[in-house]
């Protein structure tokens, strides 16, 4: 073991266990005054982000029993391109509060961009660290890198309307907001941020609302929405675009997009700028507490820069003198959090906020040990899945995946599962004849399933019951990928 004390500067260290073939490549920031500890049998290198001075700490005299014997072997595992990617995209401070002493929760290795499916099997794709860090000041969780959003959202293949579950979710949500927020069908102006193909705004039009606007950066999805008659602005929500967007919204929706912004404060400022004095912002995010409790690590991918609890969201919005006045849990994405926000500092805070904050504190949302335990359990899950996969293949079972959501890219790349799955079928036609990046598993139409004796492994596990019910003719054997995670 070797220790280095950094007396000046900053580095990104990259290391990988060379004994364990499944070990991920991991990055870690070392700041001034901190130690770098290099374990035996580990490939290790440093990317210097500043002028840096460090001391090698050695026990005792240099003249020891191994003196003069080479115990470090040259092993290049970070090239110039990777170094430049790290320097460009690494996030050194908390995007919520600015704290630069972030703690590592889990590393899922270097992974491709989850929704950037390959058009050809030999097409190259860039890999980026997929790692979650924790801020012990505001309790925000975020990725260690922030990939340029234009690489992920300019041409987006995920269409929310493909899922009946999501269509029904947004229909019910629209009815709820109409009733409880006392909206007016003729006068109320509704904006949806990251509106996709218009799935959340269509129910408002169906209810008779006249003034709706979607804001969607993916050109292909904005075109789909506009063709449906759902007025959509094609672009990111950022200050330079505000002059192109009508203001004084009575309701602003942000469903599963608030985690998708690296420029988080700019996004919040834009939303508050577009909001009328008495208007309401409703935000839905995947709920961090569900991720930690249910071990749904596959909800981690590069599009999701942030992972939110109510605790961290309250801390965030307090910076803008905006108040979360109501909170509730919803079932989407394996467990989500919905919050209601107003500019009015005197707004009455619903008891749901106090109760949820107390529940989070009791769970340990402010205790780093909670996050460390989560990380340990995720590595154990990988061991279990690989062992259980091997058992299935030993029975000469042909495995076909069902569903190619972003979570499938994360899980399959983390597990290192490639040829063990023959192919994947998908309801979304935009994904047909493409390949999962990294593992290069082909995605096909359901018509390619010819034998009911095949095992259908449901990768879109949050829709398992619906998939099994609606596709019973395809297979006699459905298996939820979550069932492979147990230690059987």
Indicate where each model-derived feature is located.
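N-terminal juxtadomain amphipathic helix
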Residues: 89-165, 328
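Flexible, glycine-/basic-rich loop-and-beta segments that form/coincide
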Residues: 333-377
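Short acidic-glycine-tyrosine-enriched beta hairpin
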Residues: 18-39
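Glycine- and acidic-residue-biased ligand/ion/polar-headgroup-sensing regions
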Residues: 1-12, 16-18
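Conserved beta-strand signature within the Rossmann-like core of class I S-adenosyl-L-methionine
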Residues: 278-286, 479-480
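A short glycine-rich, Lys/Arg-flanked "PGG" loop and its adjoining helix->strand segment in the class I
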Residues: 265-280
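Double-stranded beta-helix
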Residues: 19, 45-86
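Short, glycine-/aromatic-enriched active-site segment of Class I SAM-dependent methyltransferases
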Residues: 283-306, 310-312
